[in-house]
């Protein structure tokens, strides 16, 4: 039985899907104006792991993750680069797909783009105006937060607490608002900006409305799980809830999940702080699976500190698991012990996808395998566990000449011609093939 920590209720709740054996997930994707950094990748890897575990347990998962390709940051970056916003966003969408593929992130069921949903966004905003949840002001359209019952309950804040923080704002946009907390659903276009015609003049969507529209258009008025980074809890997800539930009158998402930050020297990694490392740059020197394994070692809600040592440890641990998979199969293994490993793994992951405890079980099982318990069922169970973490090793294929050398060495050993056997071992070692002579035969692995 899977239990999820729901940010809305601040409690662990049993997962009950809207549709039996199906999970509908919407995870906020990147604003595509630059390469993603390791902190951004944490969200992609965390929710991919969650998706994979749902699939491991037999669920069909509809996994939707958007690309925000209309945004102030994109417009600014495109202007600086001398290209159109679409050219810039296309470039970094391609980079995101390439980077996350290297991290073993499965393709989403759909990756909607804001530019493809402009008509639906306009219709959504019109509906909110008709219901008196929104108003037009000088070409902009704002959402009335005071009309939203329990506004900001996701962030565990009251409207009065938020109003105190907003009371000192004096910018031009705030002057148009009925309440400083009201947020933009539609922004009037400035000269030279990308824009679309609407009942309120040329403009473009506000950030928050985009996800509400894409999520409900694809998955319906109520979805099982909405996820994203902890920094999206307020205001982004808070505003999504307000506008979505105002339009439909229904609960927007039954479970809210937020992943923790990647930190550097225990400070959040971010572009604004200038302490970030892009995945694109990291992949020049670090294998994608190593980076993935590092990100998966901590339970998704907890922060994870990025250090060279942590990456080095991930590399060593991954190599150990790979070598474990290359053990020669044995004829027998304790079936009850195998069953206990599987149960322990599921207990760990059922507890709010506790990957830290799940990986501990994996290493305990690897130790058991290395002690001589490695039948085909054991191998299958072990590979399925690793796949939950996105760790999938391709079968090593030995070239014909290497296979022949191993066979020739075995023949020499059988004939007690140890000089030839040792020479062949040295020859294989020079090609990166390490041989281990065990009671069950020759075990090999690549250095």
UniProtKB/Swiss-Prot annotation:
GO molecular-function term, one example from the UniProt record: zinc ion binding
EC number: 6.1.1.16
Alphabetized SUPFAM superfamilies for the sequence: Anticodon-binding domain of a subclass of class I aminoacyl-tRNA synthetases, Nucleotidylyl transferase
Predominant location: cytoplasm
Residues that coordinate or bind Zn(2+): 28, 211, 236, 240
Disulfide linkage: none
Localization per Swiss-Prot or TrEMBL: Cytoplasm
Quaternary structure, from the entry: Monomer.
Protein family (similarity comment): Belongs to the class-I aminoacyl-tRNA synthetase family.
Protein name: Cysteine--tRNA ligase
Native source organism of the sequence: Streptococcus pyogenes serotype M28 (strain MGAS6180)
Name of the gene this protein is made from: cysS
